[in-house]
């Protein structure tokens, strides 16, 4: 008797149904507005739901979908979700569907002579072009790289070098470059171990195969290596993060900038007669900072502008703290102290969050608003070494890419979460390894700590894709159409 009742109960559970209202914020895949709630078995999982939506849309070629309930991805059956969240099957369940991840495939790798520390992209969709209302023709996108050999290079999409910055003798960097960005289609900024921020004029010949990176302005103020740069082109402003524990606030226009501190300028005694001779035709204006922001007690790894308000800046440091600055008055507004050294920083403005990569192998999402009651809103786990570079998904407010010394880049969707003893934890939705390992036949091999393949910099562009730079002396480009759903 009991066996029969058990089988009846199991059948009832299997046959249990729930009303679901399927919606999408993406117009091209949305169901008609008059589509009402649908009765479905609670045993359905993602694949069956995806089939259902494709049938309702009448798609000849199925589109893989992901499903969100209350802002989090469905990773179980509907029944398990209802049970875990104490929701009655009598309620109508709102389920949002979005396009599933398309793995970002390897497109190309550009080889260098030395480690590549930094990358940036110039395309119609990149900030440098869109803020300048410039149109970059398809196929004419450019990639900027900064290298440990002290040189900047601008590449075309066919892996050809269009332009290289001058050597130290001709007005270039005198040590390794750690950061490089396009300010506009004809302006570049870079910084590194020589403690200077340098602004360059970029121009191309009519054939599009050759160009010039010419020194335009040298900015002095830091007393230690510069680790990262952030640019706000409309206001002609730059932020720099330095190992001297300070943040530099600069103007890209020499007419706005104060005189450079005399004690930091290259001493005349250090200039050899050979260099003087070479430099006789190169006269580069030298200026100082608008302000040096000092409060951190250890090297500053990153400094960025608030995405919505360029008068606000944020900095992350090895001293474990995230600091908010009023850039108009050059004053400290707020300090958030975490448990680990912070090595990288990115703003997710739609969610009022800052993502900070840490020495403890994870990414902490921090709400910088004074009203926030907790420091860490969420933790993203998956890397096995320090997280040293972050970039926002240009097409989704939920997306983030991270570059790590473990030799991988990871794509995150902050809706892909689980809850454990440490609170809300995010899991990466895709991991990108270095193509150089695969070519050596070691794609499955685990490099201890990412030895030889550390990722130093990453950029995510809406046109070109994910561009990463590393210890393998390469820029690597990966692209997957609509990697995350937009929102």
UniProtKB/Swiss-Prot annotation:
Q: Which SMART domains match?
A: WD40 (SM00320)
Assembly and oligomerization: Component of the NOP7 complex, composed of erb1, nop7 and ytm1. The complex is held together by erb1, which interacts with nop7 via its N-terminal domain and with ytm1 via a high-affinity interaction between the seven-bladed beta-propeller domains of the 2 proteins. The NOP7 complex associates with the 66S pre-ribosome. Interacts (via UBL domain) with mdn1 (via VWFA/MIDAS domain).
Assigned keywords, A-Z: Nucleus, Repeat, Ribosome biogenesis, rRNA processing, WD repeat
Taxonomically, the superkingdom here is Eukaryota
Q: Which family does it belong to?
A: Belongs to the WD repeat WDR12/YTM1 family.
Q: Which SUPFAM superfamilies match?
A: WD40 repeat-like (SSF50978)
Compartments where located:
Nucleus, Nucleolus; Nucleus, Nucleoplasm
Briefly, what is this protein's role? Component of the NOP7 complex, which is required for maturation of the 25S and 5.8S ribosomal RNAs and formation of the 60S ribosome.
* Gene that this sequence comes from: ytm1
The UniProt entry's GO biological process terms, in alphabetical order, are: chromosome organization; maturation of 5.8S rRNA from tricistronic rRNA transcript (SSU-rRNA, 5.8S rRNA, LSU-rRNA); maturation of LSU-rRNA from tricistronic rRNA transcript (SSU-rRNA, 5.8S rRNA, LSU-rRNA); protein-RNA complex remodeling
Q: Where is this region: Ubiquitin-like (UBL) domain?
A: 18-99
Which PROSITE patterns would you find in this protein's record?
WD_REPEATS_1 (PS00678), WD_REPEATS_2 (PS50082), WD_REPEATS_REGION (PS50294)
GO CC, sorted alphabetically, is:
nucleoplasm; PeBoW complex; preribosome, large subunit precursor
A single GO molecular-function term is:
ribonucleoprotein complex binding
Chain positions of WD repeats: 126-165, 172-210, 221-260, 295-335, 337-376, 382-422, 450-487
Q: Report what the protein is called.
A: Ribosome biogenesis protein ytm1
